[in-house]
Amino acid sequence: MNMHIVSPVLLLFWFGIIVTDGKLKSGFIGGSHHHEVNPIEGILRESLRSNRVQACDGERITLSCPRNTQISVQTGFYGRVVPENQLCPPQAGRKHSEANLDPLSMIHHSSTCDVIQAHTRISELCDKRRKCTVVVDSNTFEDDPCPTTSKYLQMAYGCIPMSFDEETFCTPKPTDPPRPEIRLECREGRRLAVYSAQMKTSPQCDPETEIRHECVSDVLPQVLRQCHAKEGCTLKSDGIKGHCRHGHLHVVYVCVNEEIFSEEAIKGELTSLETYLKEADAMQKQDDERFFKDVNDKTQWERVVDSEPAKDPDVHQIANDASYVTHDEYRMEKQDPPPITERVEPNLVGVGHDLLQVVQFFKENKEKAVMCIVLAVSMAAIVVLSACIITRLCSSNKDSSRSSRRSRSRRSLETSKLVSSNYGGSITPQHMMQDIEDEQFLRFSMGSAATSNPHYSHYDF
């Protein structure tokens, strides 16, 4: 496997992207993840009533769904498959422009035209919204393979529930008196849409009991069979089977307008629901067999563990006692040598690849690239300016210290000259320093015997 070292330039731009985005991105970009398809979502989509809409070029359509539901586009077609004289004739301006066309060409263009991205485009505009307005023209669909042909839009959509309620029904224990049956019911004009049903342990129902092991058992098929798309349903607490010994029913459902359900859903004739229930029954049988087998194996294991093994007199017993060891023993086992890793040297291919990535980043993210460059230049300018200021301060401090030392030395020199001239070299250094420290002194300098006039000097520092 060829590896290379990422260049510092690419690392700088990655850092800039992280700073400008304000969040750390994952190292794997655009990775595909496998998501299991939830069968209940397919059942819910098949349960929806299909609302069909048709409009010609230049018209406007509005899609809307009841409260607590959202639009789910099922089909979408924009183009033409029938002649213009049968559906959505061309407008006056377009009809006049087509007057000079070949009749055979007009028949061809007026009969076949299909904008393949129509379904995707309508889904982008209207999915997961409660209300949506679409203008039927070629500008809405961003591509028109047949501009001389008058087209129309045909689509279908359903209203799927967007939020569900959760409720836990505490089932009685075997020692408790029997309680009334569980009843799920919607008000008039609404029906049940069940999303999930489980039997599981719940601290809400057993506040005084410590739950050591959480247990969850799926009972969605049993609840769907009795409650889906119904105005109400009754569930018997002892009729719902699960593997949890002390489980309670936890249902995720919602009551929505009756108008969103299809006739097949109301009658309980959904193909996807029947297939799901059959598969669930088969899996339930396998789970039951596996569960009871595990229980039997566990019982046999407990029986074997509880029973004491027979003692064989011929088998020597070794006591777990180390008192007979008279000295410490050390043993060094041979270990495998550590794996040798080859040193990865930078190569031109890796650097070139990094530079290409930087160029590609510039093309796709111009604003972020400019912001990264501005940020890098600003940081560099701040660092240089700080270095200049620190250098200037250090040099000024050195100059001031030098000037102070020079002034002190100059003053000491002048003082020594004055004192030496006064004493004429006859005074000792001890007397000189004493007079300088006193700062005020009076000295008489006695000359030679020939000198008639006495000379004295007085200095007051």
UniProtKB/Swiss-Prot annotation:
Q: Which PROSITE patterns match?
A: SUEL_LECTIN (PS50228)
Outline the extent of the SUEL-type lectin domain. 55-160
Annotated transmembrane regions: 370-390
The subcellular localization recorded is: Cell membrane
Query: What would be one Gene Ontology cellular-component term for the protein?
Result: M band
Bias-annotated ranges (Polar residues):
415-429
Q: Where is the signal peptide?
A: 1-22
Which UniProt keyword terms apply here? Answer: Cell membrane, Membrane, Signal, Transmembrane, Transmembrane helix
Q: Which GO terms describe its molecular function?
A: carbohydrate binding
What membrane topology was assigned to this protein in its record? Single-pass membrane protein
Q: Which superkingdom?
A: Eukaryota
* Renumbered residue ranges of the record's region Disordered: 397-429
| Gene3D superfamilies reported in the protein's UniProt record | 2.60.120.740
Assigned protein family: Belongs to the EVA1 family.
Role description: Acts as a receptor for slt-1. Required for the guidance of the AVM pioneer axon to the ventral nerve cord. Acts as a unc-40 coreceptor to enhance the sensitivity of unc-40 to the madd-4 midline guidance cue to guide muscle arm extensions (muscle arms) and AVM mechanosensory axons towards the dorsoventral midline.
What does the entry's domain section say? The SUEL-type lectin domain, the transmembrane domain and the C-terminal region are required for the guidance of the muscle arm extensions to the midline neurons.
Assembly mode = Interacts with sax-3. Interacts with slt-1. Interacts (via the SUEL-type lectin domain) with madd-4. Interacts (via the transmembrane domain) with unc-40.
Q: What is this protein called?
A: Protein eva-1
Q: Which organism is it from?
A: Caenorhabditis elegans
| Classification lineage | Eukaryota, Metazoa, Ecdysozoa, Nematoda, Chromadorea
Tell me the name of the encoding gene. eva-1
